């Protein structure tokens, strides 16, 4: 059985597509690594790339991406709405299949040490890979951002890195590497440019200040769109789903005469999270994920993916036809028609 992990490196560049292309090219050139998604945001001046593959291959891709970011990004000239301490700011490893969170911790520690060895970029470990309890939360590591950390590392032992010298790389800063469960980056945009309203809402909904469990949030100003945004990380969407967070943001916004005008998901999201949201807002009675066509087809195909790399289903035709021919109620005529049409 293949061992699969995900890595979601965040880079402090969201305005120069050529630089992001070069970073992605460095990572995608590693055999066995798949670039599943890339997001750029000019206001945040940040890119989020989603990689998946076998652990060693993904680790090497993350290392090469860090090296290319070090070449191309100068934090002394960087501005953006999102907090950052490094050119290759954050690199979490997430278990997918045949891999435990402990495996990802070991991989994160290995990658962190190798980043220092290759590039002389100091390393902080966070989440499950944290070496100190106060560094479990990323916001504690990023406090003061690049500029503040640059000064504090020289004189404050509590702000010194887990790996490397107590001195930031002059242009690439530091990198924060960790291991965690799947996280949903979910942002809600408001019909106001008043950042203080977004900050108040963020404070009300985040767990650290008495809000919803498994929620981290902050207010962000989107100058290019003349909007304020509540930027949210959901660390356990099954316990605190997206729809619950959206409804609380909406309720809190009403207190200040504001309202959501849209929301966005940054990166990838589990299908189950969207099913839960649809179930809630449509008020479906006795809904089961088995009613979703793609879920039923995947079951019939023995868990095979719904699409090949080229987006076609041709490679799955034989097991599907065998399932249709079997003496069972599903998949039925409607499913067969849908498959044929594809």
Where are these regions (language model features)?
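Long, contiguous binding/interaction regions
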Residues: 1-322, 326-327
